[in-house]
Amino acid sequence: MAVPPTYADLGKSARDVFTKGYGFGLIKLDLKTKSENGLEFTSSGSANTETTKVTGSLETKYRWTEYGLTFTEKWNTDNTLGTEITVEDQLARGLKLTFDSSFSPNTGKKNAKIKTGYKREHINLGCDMDFDIAGPSIRGALVLGYEGWLAGYQMNFETAKSRVTQSNFAVGYKTDEFQLHTNVNDGTEFGGSIYQKVNKKLETAVNLAWTAGNSNTRFGIAAKYQIDPDACFSAKVNNSSLIGLGYTQTLKPGIKLTLSALLDGKNVNAGGHKLGLGLEFQA
């Protein structure tokens, strides 16, 4: 293991098996294009089949690789505008600096963040400062890795309250085909996940979570099967008897169709199930 993942990416492989390939209750359209000069456009729109609410977003990104710079502009249907400037591997190898700002003309709300990340062999360190009107908050994270073993700590300090408001700890083990992840959030929320790549076509995952003082344990299993290079099938179920099914088909290069359904196993004949449709275009 050269560089360990960020704290947010610990256990990501298992989460991807549970989340990717599903879009319950949504009709979604994604479009990604890239011009000859390297300018990337990403637009996304979705409609909620229950509330009929329509949301959308637009993002443009330009990479100035010669200087390690990335410029990103964002807009969404809540009329929030965002700007992000990133410089990587310029001031020091493995160091990434990001300035992220957003502004909502409707409400006048402004937000700014400075994000820093440093990664080298066996270590991944991050520190973000959020400049909020109520007072800046600082979020720090550290992940150490050695021979597949991972240990991470994440904290959030609010200057207005002069105290740590979040303290999370995680331990895991990672190989190319197997991943184990456990975490404790604020000493009250406990979770764990296992990811197993059975073979080139089949991936499986298990997750478990519970809260101190609550006897309700949340448990789920999921699997993803690559039928052929252009099609894959996903399925998951949890201890609430909710069954998720997903099918993704590449219709032609750059066009991908996703169909998904969420079924209530306790009330199969009662209705209330959710369906999802997604189309992704990439050029």
From Swiss-Prot:
Cross-link (Glycyl lysine isopeptide (Lys-Gly) (interchain with G-Cter in ubiquitin)): K12, K20, K53, K61, K109, K110, K161, K266, K274
Highest taxon of source: Eukaryota
Membrane topology: Multi-pass membrane protein
Binding positions (ATP): K12, K20
Modified residues (Phosphotyrosine): Y67
Known tissue expression: Expressed in erythrocytes (at protein level). Expressed in heart, liver and skeletal muscle.
Annotated site location: Involved in ceramide and phosphatidylcholine binding. Critical for channel structural stability and gating: E73
Gene3D superfamilies in the cross-refs: Porin
PTM characteristics: Phosphorylation at Ser-193 by NEK1 promotes the closed conformational state preventing excessive mitochondrial membrane permeability and subsequent apoptotic cell death after injury. Phosphorylation by the AKT-GSK3B axis stabilizes the protein probably by preventing ubiquitin-mediated proteasomal degradation.
GO biological process, alphabetically ordered: apoptotic process; behavioral fear response; calcium import into the mitochondrion; epithelial cell differentiation; learning; lipid transport; mitochondrial transmembrane transport; monoatomic anion transport
InterPro entries documented for this protein: Porin_dom_sf, Porin_Euk, Porin_Euk/Tom40
PTM-bearing positions, type N6-succinyllysine: K20
Modified residues (N6-acetyllysine): K20, K109, K252, K266
Record PTM Phosphoserine, positions in chain: S13, S193, S240
Catalytic activity field: chloride(in) = chloride(out); K(+)(in) = K(+)(out); ATP(in) = ATP(out); Ca(2+)(in) = Ca(2+)(out)
Family statement drawn from the similarity comment of this UniProt entry: Belongs to the eukaryotic mitochondrial porin family.
Functional summary from the UniProt entry: Non-selective voltage-gated ion channel that mediates the transport of anions and cations through the mitochondrion outer membrane and plasma membrane. The channel at the outer mitochondrial membrane allows diffusion of small hydrophilic molecules; in the plasma membrane it is involved in cell volume regulation and apoptosis. It adopts an open conformation at low or zero membrane potential and a closed conformation at potentials above 30-40 mV. The open state has a weak anion selectivity whereas the closed state is cation-selective. Catalyzes the scrambling of phospholipids across the outer mitochondrial membrane; the mechanism is unrelated to channel activity and is capable of translocating both anionic and zwitterionic phospholipids.
Protein name, entry field: Non-selective voltage-gated ion channel VDAC1
Species per Swiss-Prot/TrEMBL record: Homo sapiens (Human)
Taxonomic lineage from the root: Eukaryota, Metazoa, Chordata, Craniata, Vertebrata
Name of the gene this protein is made from: VDAC1
